[in-house]
Amino acid sequence: MLIGEAVLAVVTVAVVAYLTYVMMYPTRF
């Protein structure tokens, strides 16, 4: 359970960071 929660947390942070990057640099897309 702990490992699964850790992986979920890492994935969530990665997705949020990616979305923030896309919103900050929309001209690249």
Swiss-Prot record:
Record bears the keyword Transmembrane helix: yes
Q: Where located?
A: Cell membrane
Query: Which top-level group of life is the source organism from?
Result: Archaea
Q: Where are the transmembrane segments?
A: 2-22
GO cellular component terms?
plasma membrane
What keywords would UniProt list here? Cell membrane, Ion transport, Membrane, Plasmid, Potassium, Potassium transport, Transmembrane, Transmembrane helix, Transport
Give an example GO molecular function: P-type potassium transmembrane transporter activity
Please summarize what the entry says happens upon disruption of the gene: kdpFABCQ and kdpFABC deletion strains are only able to grow in the presence of K(+) concentrations above 60 uM.
Where does it mainly reside? membrane
Membrane topology, record value? Single-pass membrane protein
User: Pfam families from the xrefs?
Assistant: Potass_KdpF
Free-text function comment from the UniProt entry: Part of the high-affinity ATP-driven potassium transport (or Kdp) system, which catalyzes the hydrolysis of ATP coupled with the electrogenic transport of potassium into the cytoplasm. This subunit may be involved in stabilization of the complex. The Kdp system is essential for growth under K(+) limitation, and for survival under desiccation and salt crystal inclusion.
The family assignment reads:
Belongs to the KdpF family.
- Fill in the subunit field for this protein: The system is composed of three essential subunits: KdpA, KdpB and KdpC. The complex also contains KdpF, a small non-essential subunit.
Annotated protein name in UniProt: Potassium-transporting ATPase KdpF subunit
Query: Source species, please?
Result: Halobacterium salinarum (strain ATCC 29341 / DSM 671 / R1)
